[in-house]
C-alpha cells in the first residue's frame, strides 16, 4: 500500500523540486514478522505498501509507475523504525508522504480535498510557513553524514515500490485524487442554464489566473489542473445558498418576482397601501363581505340603542307605558272615595328607584291612620318598612336616606360613622357597631339621615326599633331624632348659629352668649335672626330661622333598677334662666315609668326632657330579648295651641305645650319648630353621654329599625324640605362647602360671614323694625 498525504504541505526550493520521503511505519514486531513472511521464495521483490490509506487499485497504480525504482530508492534513504510523527514537514522521517522529488505538480500543492472559499483564506501564510519549515529541515539533513537510519527500514534484498514519477503526477491527481462531492442542490428548479453559466464563468476566471501566473511555481499549474476538473474546487466566493457562488446566484435585487413582497417588502409602497387599505378593501368588497359589514353595523347600532338610548329615555320618563296608565285608572275607579295627589310628573322606572310611592307598599292597611291627641285621624304620608333586602345608603344610593361617612365631633363620639355599617336585612334596617379601627378611631357604626330629602313641618313620626346590647348595660347611645333642615347633623359649620335656635324676636336672645356674663350660653348668637339687615345672607329675610332638635329617643340604662331608659326631649335656644321652662305647662302621664330629667341643659342647649324606663326585652341581648317597641313624637307648631307629645309604645309619656316656652328674663317666646325637620337614626358611643361599661358591651352590637312612619293632619301635608314659608334649598346651594365638608367646624372657616342684624350691626332692615 502506498500512503496518500491527508495534510496540507507546501514546499519550495531553488530546484523547484522538493521530495517528501515516504516512511514505512511498521512496528518492531511487524518488521520481524514481515521479514520472515515476506521473504521471496524465487528471489523476486515483494510489494510492500507504505500507505495504509490506499486501496489495492491505487497500490497497483503506484507500484507499476515507471519511476517506481527511483521512488523506492528515495524512500529507503530516509526511513524510521516504528514511530509516527505528525509533523507537516515532508522530509521528516515520520512523514506519511512518499518522496516526490521529481513532481513539479506536488510542489506547494495543498492536498486537502476542500478547494473552496474557506480553503483560500490562509493560503499564502500556509505556503510561507511550510517553505520555511522545509528549508530548515533540508539544512539539517544535508549536515548529517549518518545514513544508517535511512537504510534501517529497508529489508535485505527488498525494494519498496515507489510513487509515480513526476511525469504522471498530473494524471494521478486528476484521476485518482478524491475530489469535493457535488454540492447539494437546495434549489432544484434553478436549472442547468445557471449551472452552465457558472461553469463557463468559473473557467474564464481560471484561465485568467493561469495567464497571470504564467511564470509562477508549479503549484499554480497544479491548482489550475485541479480546478479545471472540479468547478467547486476553485478559489471562488461560495455563499450558503446551496453551494452556488454568490456572484452567480440567479436572483439579484434588480430582478423582480411575484413573491418579492413576502421576503423583500418595499417600505414606501407598503406605506402607500396602508394609507389606502380601507378604501381599497371597501372598493373591492364582494357581496359576502358587504353583508358581513352590514351585520356588524347592525349589531353595533343595536347595542347602542339597548344599552344607552333605551335606559336614557326610560330613566328620563319620556317612555310612558299605557299599561301603567290603564292600571292606575282601574285602581282609581274601584276606590272613588280615595283622593290621591301626584307629587311629580316624573315617571320612575323600576331599576332607577326601589319605590314609586311615598307610602311603602308593604305597610299594612291598619297602619294607614293614626289617632291624634284631639281624637282626629291623621293620614299616613310616608313609610319605609325596610323589607327590601340588601339596600345600601351611600350618598345617592337611596331616595329617602343617606348614611354619612363622618366623625360626629359635636359630641366627641368614639366611633366613625360609615355607610358600610348600614344595610337592610330580615326586614329591618340595621346599624351595626363593632370594634373595627377606622380613620384612627377604634369603633365603627352607622347613621342614616333624611337631610334635604325627606322633611316634615308638623305631624307624628313613629319608629319601631330593637335597641342594642343589654338593657341594663350603660355606655351605648342609640338615637332617633329630628333636626331643622338648615343644619346638617355632623357638619358643624352648617349648624353654627342655627342649632338649636327657634326664635322670632330681636333682643338679647340673638346675641352671642345671650349678652350674659354668667356663662349661661356659649352660643355665637342667632345667625339668621328675624332682624337681619338688608342685602345680608338670609334664606327669607324677616323670619327668624334655626335648626331646633326634637329627640324621639336617646337610649341609656339605669344600673340601679337594671332596666333601660329612654330620654325624650326638646332642645332649643335661647335659654331660660337656669334652663328651667314653665313646668306648669308640661304634662306627665305616668310617674311610675316617666319622670322629668334632672338635666335641663347646658351652655350649648336647653333641654326640656323626661326619662322613661324601658323593658329589657326590647333590647338585642338578654332573656326573652329581641322584641321591637315603637317610639314616637306628635306635634303641632301653632303659637297658641301647639304642643309636642312623646310616646313609648301606644302610651304617651309626657306633653310639652307651647305656653311653657313663654318669655323669661330678657328673652322672648321660643317657638315649637316651624322649620322643615329631617329624621336621623344612629348608634353612637361617647364619654359625653354616659359611663361606658366596656366589659359588658359585646361587640358587635346592632340597633335594628323595623319601620319609620310619618303621619300628618288632613289638609296639612308637607313632606318637603323646601316649603314656601321656610325655604332651605337655595340657601343650602349657596353654601355647599359648609353642608358637604364635615371637616369644617366653623361658618367662617367654610368661607362665609355672619349676616349683620339691626340690633348690633348698625344697619337697617326693610322687613323688621324695633319699634
UniProtKB/Swiss-Prot annotation:
Primary localisation category: membrane
Coiled-coil region(s): none
Residue span of region Disordered: 1-112, 126-186
Skewed-composition ranges (Low complexity): 14-37, 76-93, 126-152, 159-177
GO MF: glucosidase activity
PANTHER family from the UniProt entry: BETA-GLUCAN SYNTHESIS-ASSOCIATED PROTEIN KRE6-RELATED
Name this polypeptide is given: Beta-glucan synthesis-associated protein SKN1
Organism in which the protein naturally occurs: Saccharomyces cerevisiae (strain ATCC 204508 / S288c)
Gene from which this protein is expressed: SKN1
Amino acid at each position: 500500500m502506498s500512503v496518500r498525504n491527508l495534510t496540507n504541505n507546501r514546499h519550495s526550493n531553488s530546484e523547484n523540486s522538493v521530495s517528501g520521503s515516504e516512511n514505512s511505519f511498521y512496528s518492531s514486531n511487524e518488521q520481524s514478522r514481515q521479514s520472515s513472511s515476506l521473504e521471496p521464495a524465487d528471489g523476486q521483490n515483494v510489494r510492500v505498501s507504505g500507505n495504509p490509506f490506499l486501496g489495492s487499485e491505487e497500490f497497483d497504480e503506484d507500484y507499476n509507475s515507471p519511476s517506481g525504482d527511483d521512488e523506492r530508492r528515495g524512500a529507503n534513504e530516509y526511513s524510521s523504525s516504528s514511530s509516527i510523527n505528525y509533523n507537516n514537514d515532508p522530509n521528516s522521517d515520520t512523514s506519511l508522504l512518499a518522496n516526490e522529488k521529481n513532481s513539479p505538480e506536488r510542489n506547494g500543492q495543498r492536498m486537502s480535498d476542500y478547494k473552496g472559499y474557506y480553503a483560500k483564506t490562509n493560503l499564502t501564510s500556509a505556503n510561507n510557513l511550510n517553505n520555511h519549515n522545509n528549508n530548515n529541515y533540508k539544512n539539517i539533513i544535508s549536515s548529517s553524514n549518518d545514513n544508517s537510519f535511512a537504510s534501517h527500514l529497508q529489508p535485505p534484498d527488498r525494494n519498496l515500490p515507489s510513487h509515480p514519477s513526476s511525469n504522471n503526477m498530473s494524471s494521478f491527481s486528476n484521476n485518482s485524487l478524491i475530489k469535493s462531492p457535488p454540492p447539494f442542490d437546495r434549489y432544484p428548479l434553478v436549472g442547468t442554464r445557471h449551472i452552465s453559466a457558472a461553469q463557463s464563468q468559473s473557467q474564464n476566471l481560471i484561465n485568467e489566473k493561469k495567464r497571470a501566473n504564467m511564470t509562477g511555481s508549479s503549484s499554480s499549474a497544479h491548482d489550475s489542473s485541479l480546478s479545471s476538473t472540479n468547478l467547486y474546487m476553485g478559489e471562488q466566493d461560495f455563499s450558503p445558498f446551496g453551494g452556488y457562488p454568490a456572484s452567480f446566484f440567479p436572483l439579484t435585487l434588480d430582478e423582480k418576482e411575484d413573491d418579492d413582497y413576502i421576503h423583500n417588502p418595499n417600505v414606501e409602497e407598503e406605506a402607500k397601501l396602508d394609507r389606502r387599505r380601507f378604501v381599497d378593501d371597501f372598493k373591492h368588497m364582494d357581496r359576502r363581505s358587504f353583508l358581513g359589514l352590514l351585520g356588524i353595523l347592525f349589531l353595533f347600532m343595536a347595542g347602542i340603542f339597548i344599552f344607552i338610548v333605551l335606559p336614557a329615555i326610560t330613566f328620563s320618563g319620556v317612555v310612558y307605558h299605557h299599561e301603567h296608565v290603564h292600571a292606575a285608572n282601574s285602581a282609581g275607579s274601584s276606590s272613588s272615595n280615595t283622593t290621591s295627589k301626584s307629587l311629580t310628573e316624573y315617571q320612575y322606572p323600576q331599576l332607577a328607584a326601589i319605590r314609586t310611592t311615598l307610602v311603602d307598599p308593604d305597610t299594612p292597611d291598619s297602619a294607614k291612620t293614626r289617632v291624634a291627641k284631639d281624637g282626629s285621624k291623621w293620614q299616613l304620608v310616608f313609610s319605609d318598612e325596610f323589607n327590601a333586602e340588601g339596600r345600601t345608603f351611600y350618598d345617592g344610593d337611596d331616595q329617602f336616606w343617606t348614611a354619612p361617612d363622618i366623625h360626629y365631633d359635636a359630641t366627641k363620639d368614639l366611633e366613625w360613622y360609615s355607610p358600610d355599617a348600614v344595610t337592610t336585612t330580615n326586614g329591618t334596617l340595621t346599624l351595626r357597631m363593632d370594634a373595627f379601627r377606622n380613620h384612627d378611631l377604634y369603633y365603627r357604626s352607622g347613621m342614616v339621615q333624611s337631610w334635604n330629602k325627606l322633611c316634615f313641618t308638623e305631624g307624628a313620626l313613629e319608629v319601631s326599633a330593637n335597641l342594642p346590647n343589654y338593657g341594663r348595660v350603660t355606655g351605648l347611645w342609640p338615637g332617633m331624632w329630628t333636626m331643622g333642615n338648615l343644619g346638617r347633623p355632623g357638619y358643624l359649620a352648617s349648624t353654627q348659629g342655627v342649632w338649636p335656635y327657634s326664635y322670632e324676636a330681636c333682643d338679647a336672645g340673638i346675641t352671642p352668649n345671650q349678652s350674659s356674663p354668667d356663662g349661661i350660653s356659649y352660643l355665637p348668637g342667632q345667625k339668621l335672626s328675624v332682624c337681619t339687615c338688608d342685602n345680608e345672607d338670609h334664606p327669607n329675610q324677616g323670619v327668624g330661622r334655626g335648626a331646633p332638635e326634637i329627640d324621639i329617643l336617646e337610649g341609656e340604662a339605669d344600673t340601679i333598677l337594671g332596666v333601660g331608659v329612654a330620654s325624650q326631649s326638646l332642645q332649643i335656644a335661647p335659654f331660660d334662666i337656669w334652663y328651667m321652662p314653665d313646668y306648669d305647662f308640661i304634662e306627665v302621664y305616668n310617674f311610675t315609668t316617666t319622670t322629668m330629667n334632672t338635666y335641663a341643659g347646658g351652655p350649648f342647649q336647653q333641654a326640656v326632657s323626661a326619662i322613661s324606663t324601658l323593658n329589657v326585652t326590647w333590647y338585642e341581648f338578654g332573656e326573652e330579648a329581641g322584641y321591637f317597641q315603637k317610639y314616637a313624637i306628635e306635634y303641632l307648631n301653632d303659637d297658641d295651641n301647639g304642643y309636642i307629645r312623646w310616646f313609648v309604645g301606644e302610651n304617651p309619656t309626657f306633653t310639652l305645650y307651647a305656653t311653657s316656652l313663654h318669655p323669661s328674663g330678657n328673652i322672648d317666646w321660643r317657638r315649637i319648630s316651624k322649620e322643615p325637620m329631617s329624621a336621623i337614626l344612629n348608634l353612637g358611643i361617647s364619654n359625653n353621654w354616659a359611663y361606658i361599661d366596656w366589659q359588658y358591651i359585646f361587640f358587635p352590637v346592632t340597633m335594628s329599625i323595623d319601620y319609620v312612619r310619618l303621619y300628618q293632619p288632613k289638609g296639612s301635608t308637607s313632606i318637603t324640605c323646601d316649603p314656601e314659608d321656610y325655604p332651605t334649598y337655595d340657601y343650602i346651594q349657596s353654601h355647599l362647602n359648609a353642608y358637604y365638608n364635615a371637616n369644617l367646624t366653623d361658618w367662617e372657616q367654610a368661607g362665609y360671614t355672619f349676616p349683620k342684624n339691626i340690633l348690633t350691626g348698625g344697619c337697617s332692615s326693610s322687613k323688621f323694625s324695633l319699634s
